[in-house]
Amino acid sequence: MENLKNRTAREVLDDHLNLAQKWEGAEVDLETVVRDDLERNVSQEIVVLTNRGTLHGYQGVMELALMLGEELPEHNAFQYTYVSAEGRMAFLEWAHVDATTRVRDGADSYLIEDGTIIVQTIHYTVEQK
């Protein structure tokens, strides 16, 4: 079994982002994709700060993922427009486009320790086309 605790912040972020791209397509089981990500990359005590509220733990991450799945129902791939990491911190800018909605201002930040995301901030605005 691979040792995930010794990964750099960038390695954790890259793994998280690669798994997030697996949600593409309506036939994908979003909960399975999220569970895989939780097991590999997310602390059980994670705190997620969003413009929709503060969420805690695996249950909070799952709630947020399901909400995002409803807001972006075509489940197209995310476009990662900027990715960086330094020390324990990482930052992501992202966008999403489908037939009826778009996100142009996605911005997430991450605090990563011992190979897991312990704090994440998320901001995005869903626009109807």
Predicted regions located by residue number:
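Hydrophobic alpha-helical core bundles mediating ligand binding, dimerization, or RNAP-core interactions
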Residues: 13-20, 42, 65-69, 92
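A solvent-exposed, acidic/Ser-Thr-rich amphipathic alpha-helical stretch
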Residues: 32-86
